[in-house]
Amino acid sequence: MTGGQIRPGALIRSDSHSRLTPAAAEAVRSQPIARILDLRWSRELAADPSPFFADPFYRHVPLLNDPMGYDPPLDTYAPMLDHNTTRIARAFHEIATAPPGTVVIHCRGGRDRTGALTALLLAVAEVSPAEIAADFARTPGTSPEAMHNTLTHATTRYGGVPNYLTHCGVAPTALAAIRHRLTITA
């Protein structure tokens, strides 16, 4: 990693919070949560409501068009990047403008949508592609190769993740704010 060390507690990825008990939801609320981004589709949220829906730090930001409009391949999230630029830009805006504290990102399973957005965030923080792929592979049912292929696509097609995000409409000031939020610089 060249961007410094990731700030402990700056970013948490998880699966759906709909199964949290009331006590567990209160335990989450007692933490310094700045933003919870729920990346699920509206129909997923309707079927399994978030216990944080009414909290001021909660944002419902579906990361994918519904329907997606493409068949997702198993070995890359490249189509997710190519077909959801506006949604990805909105997620980055919500993170960049969040108050100080922890950002929690989740979808239904905490793998695909959450993993892809987390990878983009870590790339902005200048974490190496190998480290991002290894971090992604810690989630059961994921492949480091899929994330490696996704990051390679961002580099080949857009000239890197920062250029991809600029293409999406994310302002350079937002990228700098996210980098600052996520890292401890030496």
Segments from the language model and where they lie:
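Ser/Thr-glycine-rich phosphate-binding loops at phosphate-binding pockets of nucleotides
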Residues: G109, R113-T114
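Cys-dependent protein tyrosine phosphatase-like superfamily
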Residues: M1-V104, A116-A186
